[in-house]
Amino acid sequence: MKILCAVLALILSTMLPAQAQTTSLPGGAKIAGLAGQRDLIQEEKNRALVVEFYTEVLSHRRVDLADKYLSADYIQHNPYAATGREAFVAFFTDLFRRYPQSEHRIIRTATDGNLVYLHVFARNDPNDRGRAVVDILRVDNGKIVEHWDVVQPIPETSANTNGMF
């Protein structure tokens, strides 16, 4: 009975209107939260688009397909990469040239409205311990329009045995 109630609560929670919230950050930046109901079918379409993009363009190194997935005015928040689809192509063309054995592997995904979250294992070559990456991509009208990421090197030793994935 407890499981049935928990499942029912989860289903109903996706049908309730989300509360709009605004969060202020240092420097005056504001982040608007969700407003309205979640569209789980659209969220799944967005997730599938982002996973296909990541697999084709990053894992298979097909930067020539960027225009299929990225808007022309793609917004980049990574401080080491410029904004725009053409800048994305230039950045990853150079990265793949410098690191021909680099690896980008999706471990898990999640969605929230028009945002898709990826938890990724990435490394430049087989001898590299790698990095744990969280990519956040915003999708609008079937195109990826914005990207944020957080990158953490995988340490040689850890205070626990849980691993990063």
Language-model segments: residues:
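A solvent-exposed, acidic/Ser-Thr-rich amphipathic alpha-helical stretch
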Residues: 63-112
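Short loop/turn motifs at secondary-structure junctions and domain boundaries
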Residues: 52, 99-100, 126-129
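Short beta-strand segments that buttress and anchor functional surface loops
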Residues: 118-125
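Short, low-complexity N-terminal intrinsically disordered segments enriched in polar/charged residues
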Residues: 20-68, 161-165
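Bacterial N-terminal signal peptides
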Residues: 5-15
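Short beta-strand edge/turn micro-motifs at domain boundaries
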Residues: 133-163
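Short, solvent-exposed coil/turn segments at beta-strand boundaries
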Residues: 66-69, 111-115, 137-145
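Short, surface-exposed coil-to-beta transition loops
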Residues: 102-104, 129-134
